[in-house]
């Protein structure tokens, strides 16, 4: 039985809620609605398409802005009336130019889960590749090559260990931040990402 035929369309009056989640960071990006046609088009094109209740037509996210949502997977909930759609967003998801439509909490404050921040930091560091070495420390690291970046990772690893053995928790946090920063730079230098690391951890966990 296919996903489309498994959904209880009668229960949802022909429109199933689709929660859109960043496949890498796990951040919830937006909520949309799909009818059968929108879901079929999403599965066929691998770009998320909704049914627009205001325009009363199919609407592919990013069709005018270019900020499309590249489909990674779709899961149906236990009641067969809600979809979890995991995507790789191309550009900001919200029409306000923010990564997610859920940036503000009930009090208007902007909160970011730690893993979401790491993902955003990774994107910033990735964008420094090929930049003028004098424009930033990160760009200068990339310019000096893999050997220097690897050396920095090693140095920071030693400093993390020394901070831990000395019992200085504040220093341990600072040195750990330096280590993670340089590790992300090294991964990017090698054409890898934090997602590759987390996938390996998940693979080991599931054994």
UniProtKB/Swiss-Prot annotation:
Q: Where is this region: Phosphoribosyl-AMP cyclohydrolase?
A: 1-117
Q: Where in the cell is it found?
A: Cytoplasm
What is an example of a GO molecular function annotated in this UniProt entry?
Answer: phosphoribosyl-AMP cyclohydrolase activity
Pathway this chain belongs to: Amino-acid biosynthesis; L-histidine biosynthesis; L-histidine from 5-phospho-alpha-D-ribose 1-diphosphate: step 2/9; Amino-acid biosynthesis; L-histidine biosynthesis; L-histidine from 5-phospho-alpha-D-ribose 1-diphosphate: step 3/9
Q: Would you tell me the Gene Ontology cellular component terms? A: cytoplasm
Q: What is its EC number?
A: 3.5.4.19, 3.6.1.31
Q: Give the residue spans that cross the bilayer.
A: none
Q: Which UniProt keywords apply?
A: Amino-acid biosynthesis, ATP-binding, Cytoplasm, Histidine biosynthesis, Hydrolase, Multifunctional enzyme, Nucleotide-binding
Residue ranges of the region described as Phosphoribosyl-ATP pyrophosphohydrolase? 118-207
- Reaction equation(s) it catalyzes: 1-(5-phospho-beta-D-ribosyl)-ATP + H2O = 1-(5-phospho-beta-D-ribosyl)-5'-AMP + diphosphate + H(+); 1-(5-phospho-beta-D-ribosyl)-5'-AMP + H2O = 1-(5-phospho-beta-D-ribosyl)-5-[(5-phospho-beta-D-ribosylamino)methylideneamino]imidazole-4-carboxamide
From which domain of life does this come? Bacteria
> Which BP terms from GO are recorded?
L-histidine biosynthetic process
**Cross-referenced HAMAP family:** HisE (MF_01020), HisIE (MF_01019)
The family classification in the record reads:
In the N-terminal section; belongs to the PRA-CH family.
PANTHER family xrefs: HISTIDINE BIOSYNTHESIS BIFUNCTIONAL PROTEIN, HISTIDINE BIOSYNTHESIS BIFUNCTIONAL PROTEIN HISIE
Which NCBIfam families does the protein's record reference? histidine_hisI, PRK00051.1, PRK02759.1
Write down what this protein is called: Histidine biosynthesis bifunctional protein HisIE
Natural source organism: Photobacterium profundum (strain SS9)
């Amino acid at each position: 039985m296919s996903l489309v035929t498994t959904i209880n369309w009668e229960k949802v009056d022909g429109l199933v809620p689709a929660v859109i989640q960043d496949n890498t960071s796990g951040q919830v990006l937006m909520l949309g609605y799909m009818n059968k046609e929108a879901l079929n088009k999403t599965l066929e094109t691998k770009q998320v398409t909704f049914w627009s209740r205001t325009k009363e037509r199919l609407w592919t996210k990013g069709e005018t802005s270019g900020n499309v949502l590249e489909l990674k997977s779709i899961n149906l909930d236990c009641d067969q009336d809600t979809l979890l759609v995991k995507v790789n967003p191309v550009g900001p998801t919200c029409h306000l130019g923010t990564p997610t439509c859920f940036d503000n909490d009930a009090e208007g404050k902007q909160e970011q889960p730690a893993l979401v921040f790491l993902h955003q930091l990774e994107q910033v560091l990735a964008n420094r590749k090929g930049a003028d070495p004098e424009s930033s420390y990160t760009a200068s690291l990339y310019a000096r090559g893999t050997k220097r970046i690897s050396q920095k990772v090693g140095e920071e690893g030693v400093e993390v260990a020394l901070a831990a053995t000395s019992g200085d928790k504040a220093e341990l946090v600072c040195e750990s931040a330096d280590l993670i920063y340089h590790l992300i730079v090294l991964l990017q230098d090698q054409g890898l990402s934090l997602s590759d690391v987390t996938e390996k951890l998940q693979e080991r966990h599931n054994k």
